[in-house]
Amino acid sequence: MSPSGNDPGRAGPAPRFAVVGNPENRRITLFADAVRAAGLPAPRVVPWVAVLRSDGADFPADEIVRLDSPGENPEVDRLLRDAQDPTRVEGSARWYARFTRATRGLRGGVRLDDPDELAVLFDKRRCHATLAAADVPVPWSPTSGAAAEPVRGWDDVRALMRRHRMPRLFVKLAHGSSASGVLAVESSADGRIRATTSVELAPEGALFNSLKVRRYERERDIAAIVDALAPDGLHLERWLPKASLRGRVTDLRIVVVAGRATHAVVRTSSSPLTNLHLGGSRGDLDAVRDAVRAAGGRWTDVLALCERAAACFPHTLCVGVDLLPAIGWRRFAVGEVNAFGDLLPRLTGLPGSGAEGLGTYAAQIAAVLRRTGLGGGLGPPNPSYRPHDAHDVYDAHHQHQQQHRTGTTHASA
């Protein structure tokens, strides 16, 4: 196909894409490469900096508009949360307010997402409530939904732990991602407490995102971290003991495109935090499927659960579902649903998914072409779907910044 995208085999004019993102980021490069590989004109790139400074952007009615992560750009981070140091944790509530306002300021075009759904996806409390209302299994939470009591600090966390008999729980920033501001908290019968987190507590009380997972065992340190995070909003979840592979705790990131589970990555870790940029490792998808079958389950049911979670956001083309397998591999729960959870370079689609041989971006383009009647794309979920092999190659992309500190990234695995 010519670079102009004019193809006599097409039923009409080639679709034109625009992507809102950070032009220097490899997310944009990978998406643009996938668009060109489909024989389409290169997408128009609209920088987040321009959107935030202009309080919006305009798109022609026939331009297909994709939003990508605003993370990993210090100037965008400053505009979203007034952060002079991108490695600081604080300011996620301000980030959320400005980001959701910016998404509502995008005018025209054919959106591949929905501002209302994005507002839910980036609020863990609302997302949890949405999933629970749809009977999608999730870890129990006392902060689920808009009517939940606010958590004003560590004293409230301690009170909720006692009231709901939660000796182990996860404390999360309501608007955080990439494990920023997440604490895995454990208490013992004798009153001792510890927290595992990537948060670095500086002597003056400032909080920094770190690439090093730390363990705090002094309650005053844990209280200081939680008290500093609380003004941005907190979400609490009962700790679901996860299954393991080869002695390492395990979970999965499943990408769902146009209603179909298309890509899967297994994440394993020696700590409660499995994020790959925090020392987690890729796991063996075949071993996961074998474990599910050995427990009497069906892999197709596992994928169907992720599709049910994605169906809660019908106007968002693609989401990344974090799936938590319970010990024994018989039960699963959805930990989170990520709007920008598709950065999985060189990973091709699951056999039988309709995305075989396609990366996550190419699968989305195929789905758009199908919707516009200009390509085969992805069909409806196949009830006989029996994946048997997927070479999950994940290139951990986070670079060390300021030695072992890292800025916000938003919804990477």
Spans of model-derived segments:
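Extreme N-terminal starter segment of soluble prokaryotic enzymes
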Residues: P13-A18
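Active-site nucleotide/adenylate-binding loops and adjacent lid/helix of ATP-dependent enzymes
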Residues: R104-G233
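Beta-strand scaffold of nucleotide-dependent catalytic cores
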Residues: V171, V182-V185, R192-S198, T250-T268, ...
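A solvent-exposed, charged loop/short amphipathic helix patch at secondary-structure junctions
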Residues: A83-A93, R194-F208, H277-V288
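C-terminal active-site "lid" helix and adjoining low-complexity regulatory extension at the edge
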Residues: G279-C318, P325-A413
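A long amphipathic alpha-helix within ATP-dependent nucleotide-binding catalytic cores
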Residues: Y216-W329
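Conserved N-proximal alpha/beta basic substrate-recognition cap immediately N-terminal to
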Residues: N22-A34, A38-A159
